Structures are given as C-alpha cells and as structure tokens.
C-alpha cells in the first residue's frame, strides 16, 4: 500500500519500509512520528479513502544539507558579501501506512 503525504510544504509518495528526507521535524532519533496530512492512498491501481488515514514513521537522524553559498557583488564599488546556509532536514523511515499504526 502507498500513500501521498504532505510535510514541510512538499509531497512525498511513501510505502512501508521507504526512507525519505523531509524538512526538519522536531524529535530525537528513534522517535516515532505520525504524518496525518495524507492526500491520497491506494494499493496497485485501486484508490482508497483517506479520511482518518495516518502514516507512521520513525526518525532515523537529524542532519543538514550541503552548504549553499550566497554571493553578492556590486561591480566597481568594492562590495562583496559571501554567506553560507545549511538547511536542516530529518531522515524518516516509514513504518506503516494505514490505520493499524495510528
């Protein structure tokens, strides 16, 4: 069974056993979280109602993405600024899709 869930402003297609990288979710590694914003669910070509459906996931790790460099320059004015940013994200392992784990 698969589901489309929304978290952190993005949508992910998940099934039991999948690992996904999402925007930061508060919690320690090993904690179980419930993703309740399920948009679509189904098995094969058959779709199922999503009312009350939840996806259970385990937090594997809290990590940071690679550094993104932001460089600003104004030519002929000796103006140069260099900033870096590392976005925080969470690695999740999907435990189950459906009401059984809720």
From Swiss-Prot:
Recite the UniProt keywords alphabetically. Ribonucleoprotein, Ribosomal protein, RNA-binding, rRNA-binding
* Signal peptide residues on this chain, from the entry's feature table: none
- SUPFAM superfamilies (UniProt xref): L21p-like
Q: Highest taxon of the source?
A: Bacteria
List the record's Gene Ontology CC terms alphabetically.
Answer: cytoplasm; ribonucleoprotein complex; ribosome
- A GO biological process held by the record: translation
Q: Name one GO molecular function term.
A: rRNA binding
Quaternary structure per UniProt? Answer: Part of the 50S ribosomal subunit. Contacts protein L20.
Q: Which family does it belong to?
A: Belongs to the bacterial ribosomal protein bL21 family.
For this protein, the record's NCBIfam families field holds:
L21
Q: What does this protein do?
A: This protein binds to 23S rRNA in the presence of protein L20.
HAMAP family hit by this protein: Ribosomal_bL21 (MF_01363)
Q: What is this protein called?
A: Large ribosomal subunit protein bL21
Q: What is the lineage of its organism?
A: Bacteria, Pseudomonadati, Pseudomonadota, Alphaproteobacteria, Sphingomonadales
Gene name on record? rplU
């Amino acid at each position: 069974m698969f589901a489309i869930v929304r978290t952190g402003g993005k949508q992910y297609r998940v099934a039991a056993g999948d690992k996904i990288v999402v925007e930061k979710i508060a919690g320690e590694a090993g904690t179980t979280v419930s993703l309740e914003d399920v948009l679509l669910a189904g098995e094969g070509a058959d779709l199922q109602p999503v009312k009350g459906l939840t996806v259970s996931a385990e937090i594997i790790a809290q990590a940071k993405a690679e550094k993104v460099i932001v460089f600003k320059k104004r030519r002929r004015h000796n103006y140069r600024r260099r900033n870096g940013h590392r976005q925080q994200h969470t690695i999740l392992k999907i435990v189950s899709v459906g009401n059984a784990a809720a």
